[in-house]
């Protein structure tokens, strides 16, 4: 609770210090500024690079990029992509899970809803995500997993992110 109050105070301070600049700002600039603040707070849920089971390479932002892992009996969770945002986003997510033993499950949290992707018989999966504003995360849960995972996340034909 104390951290939340400190963060709220910092947010109010930032808004107070920048409010004089908002008179000349366009609505898109204001949305971008507020989205950056939401993204900052949402980034605390993302697994740090040095703590990942696999390897992540970001593209445009924290929602897009490539993730790969080669595992030998790993257990844990990698929160790979996502964050907080006030903007809606449309992502294409595709990849492959090659399982030797154990399990690796791709989970997507979109605010309060959590879905698990079911790969086909060859381990491939792909889906389009219509992400609404809020907290949205793409993660993989490993349970004694031996095998490999490859995952790609990119924006679809969204002019805002081209």
Regions found by a protein language model. Name each.
Residues 1-4, 11:
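Positively charged n-region of N-terminal signal peptides that target proteins for export
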Residues 15-19:
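C-terminal motif of bacterial Sec signal peptides marking the signal peptidase cleavage site
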Residues 24-83:
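Transition segment at domain starts
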Residues 65, 132-136:
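A glycine-anchored, Pro-Gly-centered beta-turn/N-cap motif
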Residues 73, 80-91, 128-133:
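Extracellular and analogous surface-interaction loops
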Residues 89-99, 140:
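A short beta-strand element within beta-rich, extracytoplasmic domains
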Residues 100-117:
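Short, surface-exposed beta-strand/strand-loop-strand elements in extracellular ectodomains
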Residues 142-160:
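Edge beta-strands of jelly-roll/beta-sandwich modules across compartments, strongly enriched
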């Amino acid at each position: 609770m104390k951290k939340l109050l400190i963060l709220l105070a910092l947010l109010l301070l930032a808004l107070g210090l920048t409010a004089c600049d908002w008179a000349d700002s366009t609505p898109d600039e204001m949305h971008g500024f507020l989205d950056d603040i939401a993204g900052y707070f949402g980034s605390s849920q993302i697994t740090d690079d040095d703590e990942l089971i696999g390897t992540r390479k970001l593209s445009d932002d924290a929602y897009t990029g490539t993730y790969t892992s080669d595992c030998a009996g790993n257990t844990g969770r990698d929160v790979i992509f996502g964050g907080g945002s006030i903007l809606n986003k449309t992502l294409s997510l595709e990849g492959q899970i090659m399982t030797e033993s154990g399990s690796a499950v791709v989970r997507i949290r979109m605010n309060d809803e959590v879905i698990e992707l079911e790969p086909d018989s060859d381990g491939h999966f792909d889906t389009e995500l219509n992400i609404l504003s809020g907290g949205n995360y793409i993660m993989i849960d490993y349970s004694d997993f031996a095998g490999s995972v490859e995952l790609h996340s990119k924006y679809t034909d969204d002019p805002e992110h081209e």
